[in-house]
């Protein structure tokens, strides 16, 4: 491959990069080079295409960067997982397929920051709708002709889902019919990025399938970006490794970094854009001393609150190898059955205290007791709630350790560094126990398996969190958007102080959103794609949305009072 020129070079074919590649090449006169360090999204590989197989990609390195954190000082010095997608689709190729946009007040809060006024919820909602085709049809909140297929859970899938939602309502929390609609707060069915044929709806399937055949788009897989090239303070191209070759490509207009919250700051730092003292430690020539690159790192931490199930209605039999061929065959031939669901079909968001302005705790309900990555399966019928806080005040960082593009960076989330973190996790455990002991779950609920009913004091719960809490795989905010001293990009993703360079992915979120990050990342890319193309922004929505305004976190007393601790 010889040196080539393109209008735009995109580094990373993930949740954001595929959106940009597809939208930019809608203009036939625009040429785009899309670089992806991983391989194709093989459609015959059940590990990435079958929703129920979501744990498999995290267990290897074909589709997973398999990063690990530095020892986390507040988590028993554990090195914790930080899985990130590798291959066309990026993390949308290996994520849990939960389609959660965040709370409207997340975006309204962004919009209170200097010059981010056009990131308010009603400005973002049209781009959420543009990206989506929802199986039950469009409305003021949902799209009907977008690239990403979204399936919402239907009644009757598993009695545990309906019982867990009803238990939340019996505990005094709201019921909501749509976690992405008028009111996120409450318990209800989950939307999922799954096609009508029961396949994972990654951005490779949804977006790139529209664009692959365009003559103005060149996709190169197994292409690891090494450095961004500069002429003074202008980005002019990228060098990347492709097989044994080092290749240079030039960008006539812009370089677009879409490598995610770990690899985007890593690439910027390796190219000489980042905290000057970090770069000098590795003898990297400083193009721009930009102190926020790699800082402000955020994530969601979660726990598994697990119970024995007294009736044989859980997914426990599906974990047995002798039942899996039948499940796989039905999925492969018909796109139906247990294989066609990620099994996160119900969940919710609550405020644990009345003075929380919007939900601070998320629930994913699952009708089996097992870790997200497929490990530590409980050998009995069981069910669980994945529970975690949404907007931790703790902040971490991504720091380059080597100029070698194959080397992983130093990652420290600094989980649970603040007193509020501990209060919210204790509140979450106690609220979950109260939900689980409501009458709706009486016929199913057996023993509490984790943390264990004997753990009651603050110290005992804190010990459990330190030892057992895990990442929800939502790294973000490490190249934050804004105009303060630690901001990396402006309101259109343009890197401060550099021409011809943008970052467009979850790393530019100023503050993490309330929920899973795939849907917000796609929205961010859709919105910035219009700015790159100099299109007029989509018309602002006038949809109504719920604001608590000091209302009690619970609308009524629980049907069954909490156990005395």
Curated annotation (Swiss-Prot):
Assigned keywords, A-Z:
FAD, Flavoprotein, NAD, Oxidoreductase
> Active site at which residues?
474
EC primary class: oxidoreductase
The answer to whether UniProt assigns keyword Oxidoreductase to this entry is yes
Which InterPro entries has this protein been placed in? BetA, FAD/NAD-bd_sf, GMC_OxRdtase, GMC_OxRdtase_N, GMC_OxRtase_C
Q: What is its EC number?
A: 1.1.99.1, 1.2.1.8
Q: Which GO terms describe its molecular function?
A: betaine-aldehyde dehydrogenase (NAD+) activity; choline dehydrogenase activity; flavin adenine dinucleotide binding
Pfam families (alphabetical): GMC_oxred_C (PF05199), GMC_oxred_N (PF00732)
Kindly list the positions annotated as binding FAD: 7-36
Q: Which cofactor does it need?
A: FAD
Reaction(s) catalyzed by this protein? choline + A = betaine aldehyde + AH2; betaine aldehyde + NAD(+) + H2O = glycine betaine + NADH + 2 H(+)
Q: Which PROSITE patterns match?
A: GMC_OXRED_1, GMC_OXRED_2
Q: Which GO terms describe its cellular component?
A: membrane
> SUPFAM superfamilies in the record, alphabetically?
FAD-linked reductases, C-terminal domain (SSF54373), FAD/NAD(P)-binding domain (SSF51905)
User: What pathway or pathways are given for this protein in its record?
Assistant: Amine and polyamine biosynthesis; betaine biosynthesis via choline pathway; betaine aldehyde from choline (cytochrome c reductase route): step 1/1
Q: Which GO terms describe its biological process?
A: glycine betaine biosynthetic process from choline
Similarity field: Belongs to the GMC oxidoreductase family.
Protein task: Involved in the biosynthesis of the osmoprotectant glycine betaine. Catalyzes the oxidation of choline to betaine aldehyde and betaine aldehyde to glycine betaine at the same rate.
Q: Which NCBIfam families match?
A: betA (TIGR01810), PRK02106.1 (NF002550)
Name by which UniProt lists this protein = Oxygen-dependent choline dehydrogenase
